[in-house]
Amino acid sequence: SVISDKVALQKSSNVYMFKTALKVAGITYGQQSINGVTAADFQKMRNGYARFGLGVETGIDLPGEFTGVKGNETLPGKYLDLAIGQYDTYTPLQLAQYVSTVANGGDRIAPHILKEIHEPSENGKTLGRLDKEIEPTILNHTNNTQAEYNQDHKGMSMVYNTPSGTASKFFSDAKYKAAGKTGTAEVIYYGPKKEKYGTYSIT
């Protein structure tokens, strides 16, 4: 059946995301073989994700930031995995930056450890004089329209606040309104015993 972009978010439709990714690659589902996917198509998807902070440095004011792991195969099936977040890996901070970029209408803002620096308190009860205030740093603005973001906001709200939403059962009794997107974390399991290469169980 045909579903809208909002319902695709609400129900976490992999098929919708697959078809969208194939359109990005110039392939019409059902009429062409997906073997036409190229390495350039993978990069095009990653370039789009990077505008939201996925797979790149978030700009946090700490050294040695890890940017996740990019898959090195370019098989068509891996391209579809990439479309639903099941190929490249991302850090929790990257995921937070991506969601905040969607939430605020396209500004990707660098996260900071500090908001303000104050002088020592003179009375032990109130903050001392403000010495420095950390201003938000906008790293880039995505090229999506506000109308597109409005659709995203509605769809992500439906995930949490409608009976068919994939997160609704966890937030049905919440005293606040939430929005977002659910996902399935992958687990790598090598078995309960020590392997011949000296590795233990990894989850």
What positions do the PLM features span?
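Beta-lactam-recognizing serine transpeptidase/beta-lactamase-like catalytic domain environment
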Residues: 1-203
